[in-house]
């Protein structure tokens, strides 16, 4: 009611209702996972990253928690022959300063025939969109590099793909 919504009656709890007797009043179709990942990487959306990790945990253990996702992720990497040596994850958002991953892992993910293309297509274009819209302006990377970056006072990272003036694609980790 504080926002102009007037509630005329109190809701009633109803149990043991037959599914056939229910009437759908609203349906919202979720974007596909590749679009969710694109939004996450373009906007540096840490909440979405954390929620994806929890969903991974739920799909593998039945528990939608950060902990179950953290246990599941190295198993998924190993099952796909991706290296998880040197991988230490504390959260799914990527905000913990204790998270660790190797360049080799990111390189192999980008090179992976099943996942690499999806990730590469989801990365924002440097100098144009999202979290990288204001980096590398006036350089050959502007509009030729799709990347996700992280920069802090004492460290940084960049993962992406650069197309040279000769049309050669170079993966950068």
Predicted regions and their residues:
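A small/polar active-site loop signature that marks catalytic segments
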Residues: 1-117
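C-terminal soluble interaction/assembly domains
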Residues: 72, 85-173
């Amino acid at each position: 009611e504080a926002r102009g919504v007037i509630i005329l009656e109190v809701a009633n709890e109803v149990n043991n209702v037959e599914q056939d007797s229910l009437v759908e009043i609203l349906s919202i179709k979720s974007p596909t996972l590749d679009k969710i990942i694109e939004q996450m990487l373009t906007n540096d959306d840490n909440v979405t990253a954390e929620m994806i990790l929890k969903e991974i945990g739920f799909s593998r253990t039945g528990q939608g928690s950060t902990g179950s996702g953290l246990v599941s992720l190295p198993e998924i990497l190993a099952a796909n022959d991706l290296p998880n040596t040197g991988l230490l994850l504390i959260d799914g958002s990527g905000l913990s300063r204790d998270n660790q991953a190797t360049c080799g892992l990111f390189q192999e993910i980008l090179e992976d025939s099943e996942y690499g293309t999806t990730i590469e297509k989801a990365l924002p274009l440097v100098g144009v969109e999202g979290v990288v819209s204001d980096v590398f302006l006036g350089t050959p990377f502007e509009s030729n590099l799709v990347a996700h970056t992280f920069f802090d006072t004492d460290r940084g990272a960049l993962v992406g793909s650069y197309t040279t003036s000769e049309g050669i694609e170079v993966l950068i980790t």
